[in-house]
């Protein structure tokens, strides 16, 4: 099977991650997945949401948005509408959950790391790109806490990355572009850690149903893609990559609280 952009079924689009893309943020990255491009910045706020005050641990949250002309037709800015849309709220909650899964929250103290993920060009896979690029920005932001003596070790327990898989014309395919995503019979978004544990699996049949065997082969394909993405995260983080996971013995803070943003 030759896909709409010439790739093989198990082939990802070219992925590039540019670290330190924003000179002001504690951590930042530009991630390019094919023609999808997302700027991710991580900022540290020395306070936590009300529900965590006095708990002695931190929080990781995210905001997600798209530039008006990130797509073929100009969209209205959500700031003009006065509130984020339902899709943006769903995506930013997914990003927050995914990143919290690999953070030692007690080691943060009562601090919040805020990820801003802004899509400057969309061609499918914006939410999965935001998670993968957001992780790199998160790690650099966390390193500032080590540099400042807030914590002796990087409070990141594992890698996390995400990709999409789906059934397109009956074939299992990896990393769907927009044209494939729009026409796929089944579409999954998969988030996994570097040690191979699932954080989230979102799967939908678009006008059709699917079997357990389809789920298995789609997840197997997602594992291949996410392993590749984690290797790229390792490469771009350089020497800092070796610090990730050194706190893995203390995972009590890695779980999220409820489904707040």
From Swiss-Prot:
Database matches in PROSITE patterns: RIBONUCLEASE_PH
Catalytic activity: tRNA(n+1) + phosphate = tRNA(n) + a ribonucleoside 5'-diphosphate
GO molecular function ontology, one term from the record: tRNA binding
Top-level EC class: transferase
Keyword Transferase: yes
InterPro entries: ExoRNase_PH_dom1, ExoRNase_PH_dom2, ExoRNase_PH_dom2_sf, PNPase/RNase_PH_dom_sf, Ribosomal_Su5_D2-typ_SF, RNase_PH, RNase_PH_bac-type, RNase_PH_CS
The protein's Enzyme Commission number: 2.7.7.56
Domain of life: Bacteria
Subunit structure: Homohexameric ring arranged as a trimer of dimers.
Family in the record: Belongs to the RNase PH family.
Database matches in NCBIfam families: RNasePH
Name of this chain's protein: Ribonuclease PH
Origin species: Desulforudis audaxviator (strain MP104C)
């Amino acid at each position: 099977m030759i896909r709409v952009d010439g790739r093989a079924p198990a082939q990802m689009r070219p992925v590039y991650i540019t670290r330190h893309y924003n000179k002001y943020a504690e951590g930042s990255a530009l991630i390019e997945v094919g023609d999808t491009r997302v700027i991710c910045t991580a900022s540290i706020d020395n306070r936590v949401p009300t529900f965590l005050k006095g708990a002695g641990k931190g929080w990781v949250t995210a905001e997600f948005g798209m530039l008006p002309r990130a797509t073929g037709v100009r969209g209205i800015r959500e700031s003009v509408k006065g509130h984020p849309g339902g899709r943006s709220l769903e995506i930013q909650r997914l990003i927050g959950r995914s990143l919290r899964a690999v953070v030692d929250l007690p080691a943060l103290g009562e601090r919040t790391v805020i990820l801003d993920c802004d899509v400057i060009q969309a061609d499918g896979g914006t939410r999965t790109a935001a998670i993968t690029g957001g992780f790199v920005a998160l790690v650099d932001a966390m390193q500032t806490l080590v540099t400042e003596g807030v914590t002796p070790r990087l409070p990141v327990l594992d890698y996390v990355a995400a990709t999409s898989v789906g059934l397109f014309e009956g074939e299992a395919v990896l990393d769907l572009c927009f044209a494939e995503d729009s026409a796929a019979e089944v579409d999954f978004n998969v988030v996994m850690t570097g040690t191979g544990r699932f954080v989230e699996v979102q799967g939908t049949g678009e006008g059709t149903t699917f079997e357990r065997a389809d789920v298995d082969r789609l997840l197997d394909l997602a594992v291949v893609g996410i392993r590749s993405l984690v290797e790229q995260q390792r490469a771009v983080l350089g020497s800092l990559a070796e610090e990730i996971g050194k706190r893995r013995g203390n995972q009590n803070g890695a779980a999220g609280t409820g489904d707040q943003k």
